[in-house]
C-alpha cells in the first residue's frame, strides 16, 4: 500500500470514527453532567470499565490480534472459511457466557480488587453502588465478544467500515439514556441516588452494547458468510496456541491498568477524607484519556485496521522489507496527526476540557485538562508502539512483544505507586498521566529493538527526522497561541464557559491552518495526505447511503 492508498482505505473508517467520537463526546458530556467527576462517577466508571477489562484480559486481545491472520488463511479452505468462523464464534461465545456468570457472582471481589478503598469505613454507600453497577454492566462481556467477532469476520473479508460505524449506535443509545436521565433526575449525588436509578443507568449502559453488537449481524449475512452454531475445536488449535502469548500480553496490560484504577480511586477516597470537593480520581483520568485517544482513534486505528491484513499477507509471502516499509509509512502518516495533537493537548488541555465538560464545576473540568496535558507526552509513542505491535502480529509472533509490554508496565506501575505516596492526593491522578507517558516513551525503544528479528534493523532515524519537523511546525504554530491564551486568562480570569469555548474555537482554527503552513514550510511531505484523507472522507460521506 502506498501512502495515498492507506489514507483512501482509511477514509471510510476515519469518517465512522469521527462521527463515533463526536457522539461519544456528547455521551461523555452527559455522563459527566449526570454523575459529575467525584466518587459517584468513580463507582459507575469502575463498574463500566470492568466488562472491558475482563473481556480484554481473557478473550479480546486474542481475537483482535490473532484471529484476523487466521481468518485470512481460512479463506483458502474449500468452504471459504465458514467452518472456522462458526467454530470460533461458538466456542468463544460459550466461554464468554461462563465468564459473565462467574463475574456476576463474584462482583464484590472484583470491586475490592480494583477499588479497595471503597471498602474503607465511612464509604459503605460507594461500595454498595459500585457492586450494583458492576453486576448490571458485566453482561456487556458477551456482547463485546460478539461485536468483536462479527466485526473481525467482516474486516477479514475486506469490509472495514461497519466495525467503525457500529459504536455510533452504542453512543446514540447512551445519549438517549443519560439525556433522559438528566432531564428527569438532574441533581443526583452519592447520597441521593436510588437503587432504581442505579438499575436504569447500569442496565441501560449494557443495552447500548447489545445494540452495538446486533447491528453487525445483517452486515455479516450480506457478505455471504454462513455462521452456524458448531461445537468443536478442530481448526482452532493453532489459534489458541498463538492466543496463549497474547493472553500473557493482555494480562500484563490489565494488571498495569488494575494499578491505575487502584491508585486513582485511592487518591479520590483519600482526597474526600481530606475534605477536597474537586473530582481528582479515576473519572478525571478516564475522560482525559478519552480525549487524548481521539486522534489515535481517528487515524491510527483506521490505518492499522487497513494495513494489518495486507502486511499479514506480505509476511506470509516472505516480503520482510515490504512489511518494514509499510510500518514506517504508517508511522510517518500517523505522526502528521498525533504530533500536533500532542502539542495541542499539552498547551491547551485545561481550555479544551473546560469547553467540553460544561455540566460540572470549572475546577472539575480544569482538572481533567491537567491530566490530559500529562498524558499528551505519551500520545505519539503510544501510537507508534501500537503500529509496531501489529508488525509482530503479522509474523504471528505473540511471544516477543510480551517483553515490550512488560517493560512499559513495570515503569508505569513503579511511577504510579511513587506518585501515590509522594504527591499530594489531589495531584496523584495527574501523576498517573505522567507515568503513562514516560512508560510508552521508554517502551518505544524496546519495541523497536525487538522487531529487528523480523524486519531487520528498524531505526528510529527512519521517522525521527520527520517527527522533529512535525514537532517544529506544531510549536511554531501553537506557541504564540499558547501565550495568547495565557494573556486572555490573565486579563479575563472569570470568563464564562461560552467565552472559553469561543476562545478554544478561535485557537484551534488558527492552529490548524498555521500547522499546515509551517509543516509545508519545514518540508513535511506527508502533510498533503491530510487533504487526501479529507477528500476520501467527504466522498465516502456522500456515498454512505448507497453503499452502506
Task: Give residue spans per PLM region.
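Membrane-embedded alpha-helical bundles of multi-pass transporters/translocases
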Residues: 1-548
Amino acid at each position: 500500500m502506498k501512502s495515498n492508498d492507506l489514507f483512501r482505505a482509511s477514509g471510510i473508517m476515519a469518517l465512522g470514527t469521527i462521527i463515533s467520537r463526536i457522539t461519544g463526546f456528547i455521551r461523555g458530556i452527559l455522563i459527566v453532567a449526570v454523575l459529575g467527576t467525584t466518587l459517584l462517577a468513580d463507582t459507575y466508571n469502575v463498574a463500566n470499565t470492568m466488562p472491558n477489562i475482563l473481556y480484554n484480559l481473557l478473550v479480546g486481545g486474542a481475537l483482535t490480534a490473532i484471529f484476523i491472520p487466521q481468518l485470512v488463511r481460512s479463506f483458502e479452505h474449500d468452504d471459504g472459511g465458514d467452518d472456522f468462523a462458526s467454530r470460533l464464534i461458538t466456542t468463544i461465545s460459550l466461554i464468554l457466557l461462563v465468564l459473565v456468570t462467574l463475574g456476576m457472582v463474584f462482583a464484590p471481589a472484583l470491586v475490592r480488587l480494583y477499588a479497595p478503598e471503597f471498602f474503607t469505613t465511612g464509604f459503605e454507600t460507594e461500595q454498595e453502588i459500585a457492586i450494583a453497577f458492576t453486576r448490571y454492566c458485566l453482561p456487556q462481556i458477551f456482547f463485546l465478544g460478539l461485536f468483536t467477532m462479527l466485526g473481525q469476520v467482516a474486516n477479514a473479508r475486506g469490509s472495514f467500515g461497519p466495525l467503525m460505524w457500529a459504536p455510533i449506535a452504542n453512543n446514540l443509545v447512551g445519549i438517549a439514556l443519560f439525556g433522559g436521565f438528566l432531564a428527569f433526575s438532574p441533581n443526583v449525588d452519592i447520597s441521593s441516588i436510588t437503587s432504581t436509578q442505579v438499575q436504569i443507568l447500569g442496565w441501560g449502559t449494557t443495552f447500548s452494547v447489545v445494540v452495538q453488537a446486533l447491528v453487525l449481524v445483517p452486515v455479516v449475512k450480506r457478505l455471504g458468510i454462513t455462521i452456524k452454531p458448531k461445537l468443536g475445536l478442530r481448526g482452532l488449535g493453532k489459534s489458541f496456541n498463538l492466543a496463549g502469548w497474547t493472553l500473557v500480553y493482555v494480562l500484563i496490560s490489565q494488571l498495569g491498568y488494575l494499578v491505575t484504577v487502584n491508585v486513582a480511586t485511592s487518591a479520590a477516597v483519600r482526597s474526600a477524607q481530606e475534605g477536597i470537593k474537586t473530582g481528582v480520581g479515576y473519572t478525571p483520568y478516564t475522560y482525559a484519556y478519552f480525549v487524548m485517544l481521539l486522534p489515535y482513534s481517528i487515524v491510527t486505528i483506521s490505518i492499522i485496521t487497513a494495513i494489518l491484513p495486507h502486511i499479514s499477507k506480505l509476511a506470509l509471502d516472505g516480503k520482510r522489507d515490504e512489511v518494514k516499509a509499510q510500518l514506517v509509512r504508517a508511522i510517518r502518516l500517523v505522526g502528521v496527526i498525533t504530533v500536533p495533537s500532542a502539542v495541542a493537548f499539552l498547551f491547551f488541555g485545561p481550555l479544551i476540557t473546560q469547553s467540553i465538560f460544561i455540566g460540572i464545576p470549572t475546577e472539575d473540568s480544569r482538572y481533567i485538562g491537567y491530566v490530559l496535558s500529562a498524558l499528551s507526552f505519551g500520545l505519539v509513542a503510544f501510537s507508534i508502539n501500537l503500529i509496531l505491535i501489529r508488525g509482530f502480529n503479522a509474523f504471528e509472533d505473540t511471544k516477543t512483544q510480551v517483553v515490550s509490554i512488560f517493560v512499559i508496565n513495570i515503569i508505569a506501575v513503579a511511577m504510579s505507586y511513587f506518585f501515590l505516596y509522594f504527591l499530594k492526593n489531589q495531584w496523584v491522578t495527574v501523576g498517573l498521566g505522567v507515568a503513562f507517558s514516560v512508560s510508552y516513551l521508554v517502551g518505544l525503544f524496546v519495541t523497536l529493538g525487538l522487531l529487528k528479528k523480523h524486519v531487520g534493523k528498524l531505526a528510529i532515524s527512519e521517522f525521527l527526522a520527520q517527527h522533529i519537523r512535525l514537532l517544529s511546525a506544531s510549536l511554531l504554530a501553537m506557541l504564540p497561541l499558547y501565550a495568547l491564551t495565557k494573556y486572555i486568562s490573565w486579563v479575563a480570569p472569570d470568563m464564562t464557559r461560552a467565552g472559553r469555548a469561543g476562545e478554544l474555537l478561535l485557537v484551534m482554527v488558527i492552529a490548524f491552518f498555521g500547522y499546515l503552513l509551517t509543516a509545508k514550510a519545514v518540508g513535511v511531505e506527508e502533510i498533503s495526505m491530510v487533504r487526501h484523507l479529507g477528500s476520501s472522507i467527504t466522498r465516502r460521506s456522500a456515498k454512505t447511503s448507497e453503499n452502506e
